[in-house]
Structure formats: structure tokens, C-alpha cells
Amino acid sequence: TIGFIIKMDSPGGSSMAKYDYEMALNYARSKGKKIVGHIDGMACSAGYALMALCDEVYFTNPHDTVGCIGTMCAMLTNKDGDVNTVTQERYAEIYADGSPYKNKEYRAAAEGNYEGIKEELNRLCADFQQMVRERRPRVTDDQLTGKTYDAGDVVGTMVDGQGDFKFCVNRVQQLAGVSQ
């Protein structure tokens, strides 16, 4: 194996996945492997995090979507004692005496106080943005604000160019110094 192509078509996922991606790709690099990202559709949020970690990134269609760099959280705000109006089931949370801080931020959010969760989101967002800045040094500040872009409009910053899968195979070979 001389390298890897990571094919991407994803709107995103868990921001925590970034850490696993980073460990896996750094391990491959430590073994001298080249990594090329290939976007065929969408590379947004956590999907773009994986692309940013690649040595080079190419897209199939200039209208493929990239970006959405940022973090968010969606949650149901059930509170202890809430009753489902359809089933009449009661939501209950019971905590051990030794766990007063367990889910504290989520319980606060159910009461309308989002500061604890927002603090965590801000930390994860800053870490995500820093990783993208390090791996894609020409990315603009505006491209780190959660916006999405047509891949053809961000060549040189978020992506390296246009190429099909065969092109990406050739790039891995070239980067690895293997004749074709």
C-alpha cells in the first residue's frame, strides 16, 4: 500500500470523530503513506474535517458542496417529570447521590440555560477551526464560520482542484513517487 484515497459524500457527523480521523491519518503518514481526499457530492462539517486532514483534496463536480465548519447541538429538552401528552408516559431522571454534576449542562438546557453546552460547543469549534487552519493554511476566516461553498469556488483554499477518482489514484502514485 502506497497511500489512501478517502472518498467523501457526507453532510457531517459528530465533532468528536475529528480526533479519531486525526489519529488514523497521522498513523498512516508516520508509515510514509500519502492520503488524497476525493469529494463526490458533499464534504461538510465533520466530513470536511476528514478532507482537511488529507494531503490533497479534489472534487468531482464544481458544484460539490464543501465547508460548514463549525459545531452545533440539537436536543430534546425533556425535564424530569415531563409527561408525554399522547402516551401519558412520564419522563424521569434519577441520579445517584454521588453524581450531582452528571448531565448538569443538559439539565440546565432543559430549563432554558444553554451556557454550559455553548461553552463546550465553543471549545470544540475553536479546536476544529484550528485544525483546519493548520492543515489548510490558505483557508479564509470567512470559510471557518459555518458557511458552505461550491467546491469550484474555493480552489486553493479549501480544496486543491478538480479530478475524478482515477485522477486521485494517479495523484497518490505521484505523491508516493511510484511510476504509473
Residue ranges and their predicted role:
Residues 8-12, 39-43, 163-169:
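A mature extracytoplasmic/lumenal domain signature
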Residues 34, 136-143:
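A local structural motif
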Residues 38-44, 143-148:
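Glycine-rich beta-to-alpha transition loops that act as phosphate-gripper elements at the mouths
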Residues 1-33, 42, 48-135:
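Small-residue-centered hinge/linker elements
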Residues 118-138, 155-180:
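C-terminal long alpha-helix characteristic of the crotonase
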Residues 142-158:
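Acidic helix/loop microenvironments that form the catalytic cleft of cell-wall polysaccharide enzymes
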Residues 46-47, 151:
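Short, well-ordered alpha-helical microsegments
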